[in-house]
């Protein structure tokens, strides 16, 4: 066999190193997710982890993002019920908790934290009250985990959600 050109060899090596770095980073992400899932709970291809303290809606969402997740978003009644029972166990003493739903951009048009429209709602009777003051949504820890809109600056407990890559 002919000796390879040194340029091509370096490129191959560089590509291999890049590939290894991507694999290492992917493993790190999976490891972090495993830790979250172990500390919290795993439901419907998502892991949930309850907050220790209370924060405003924005601070809560930023905290979740910093940990690689978002505020939890129940996408069905099944998810909503599972989330509420986890909240009841892990947010002892909290009446409600922030979820990743708001109408900050357009009054009355509720979207998730990524700005995408949501199709599942679980509003309490006479909610949302609306108005430009109450733009962030909290779910109750009791009953059927009904939603109510509240002032975003209010300090509440929250649960972060992490999607499990399939």
Swiss-Prot record:
Keywords, ordered alphabetically: Disulfide bond, Lectin
Cite the InterPro entries for this sequence. C-type_lectin-like, C-type_lectin-like/link_sf, C-type_lectin_CS, CLec_Tetranectin-domain, CTDL_fold
Q: Which CDD domains match?
A: CLECT_tetranectin_like
Record domain C-type lectin: where: 43-161
A GO cellular component annotation in the UniProt record: extracellular space
Keyword Transport in the entry? The reply is no
Show the disulfide pairing. 37-47, 64-160, 136-152
Residues that span the membrane, as ranges: none
The domain of life is: Eukaryota
Gene Ontology biological process: ossification
What single Pfam family name could you report for this chain, choosing any that match? Lectin_C
UniProt-recorded name of the protein: Tetranectin-like protein
- Native organism is Carcharhinus perezii
Q: What taxonomic ancestry is recorded?
A: Eukaryota, Metazoa, Chordata, Craniata, Vertebrata
């Amino acid at each position: 066999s002919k000796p390879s050109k040194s340029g091509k060899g370096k490129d191959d090596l560089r590509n291999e190193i890049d590939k290894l770095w991507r694999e290492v980073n992917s493993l790190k992400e999976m490891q972090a997710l495993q830790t979250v899932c172990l500390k919290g709970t795993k439901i419907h291809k998502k892991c949930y982890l309850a907050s220790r303290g209370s924060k405003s809606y924005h601070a809560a969402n930023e905290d979740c993002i910093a940990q690689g997740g978002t505020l939890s978003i129940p996408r069905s009644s099944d998810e909503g019920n599972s989330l509420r029972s986890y909240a009841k166990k892990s947010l002892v003493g909290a009446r409600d908790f922030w979820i990743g739903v708001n109408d900050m951009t357009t009054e009355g048009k509720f979207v998730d934290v990524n700005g995408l429209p949501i199709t599942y709602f679980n509003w309490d009777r006479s909610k949302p009250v609306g108005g430009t003051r109450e733009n962030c949504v909290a779910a109750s820890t009791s009953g059927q985990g009904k939603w109510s809109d509240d002032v975003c600056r209010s300090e509440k407990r929250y649960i972060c959600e992490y999607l499990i890559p399939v």
